[in-house]
Amino acid sequence: MDDVFYANLVTLQVATPGGAGAGHGQLDPWQLVLDASPVVKIVMLVLVLMSVSCWFIIGGKLVQLLRASAQSARFLHVFWDKAQGSAWTTERLEAVYGKARSLESSPLARVFHAGYVELARVTGDADATQPAQPEVQADLDSVARALHRAANNEVTLLENLLPVLATTGSVAPFIGLFGTVWGVMNSFIGIGNLGNASLAVVAPGIAEALIATAIGLAAAIPAVMAYNYFIRRIRVLESELDAFASDYLNIVRRHFLG
């Protein structure tokens, strides 16, 4: 009889909403954000804006680098066309120049364009007779400067907006930490005003504070990963630009200004 009594009592406690098994309502993260203090809301808004801007930059930069790599590979195929042999003539450079104009997203094509234009200028200014050695060296230096300047411009263009990713990756966690510290401080102020240190009083403020840290990390982690990836891809393209500039300058030296 006692066993039946205790079984019925346990069943009644579980089924009753106000019984011992009933807990307090779960904390809703969205409601915590809405109920956050103005300072924490500003922190969260700044972090969200930083995260959104980073994702736009990541998408645009990814498309830019993929297109640059693909079109640069096509340009190298055109430039080193084996069907043309090893002979370099003005007609061959003109043909490469004509095809390179359609590869507008290729850094290599734009570097070639700069070198081609400078070569045309120095050869057009030369006399019909064979130029003296100092003049040849000056012309080579002029073409080399044009190639170097164009390569630097391409690297600068590829690195555009990457500082935003680097800044977000390094600053966003600290901005989130500031929001966390502010939220925890408000929680302790609330405890002092109420004179009650129960979990129901402390938990909302702590949860609100930790949300700021979570948003900061969510903004920083993708930014750092994308920045490192893009820097690696840009360094590969930069080495390709340097190698092509050296090869093109050797061709100019041997076949046009030798």
Task: Show where each model-derived region lies.
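Short, strongly hydrophobic alpha-helical membrane anchors
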Residues: 1-35, 196
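Predominantly long cytosolic amphipathic alpha-helical stalk/bundle segments
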Residues: 68-174, 186-198, 225-258
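Transmembrane alpha-helix/interfacial motif
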Residues: 39-81
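Hydrophobic single transmembrane helices highlighted by the model
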Residues: 25-52, 210-214
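Hydrophobic alpha-helical transmembrane segments of polytopic membrane proteins
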Residues: 209-223
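Helix-loop-helix
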Residues: 177-211
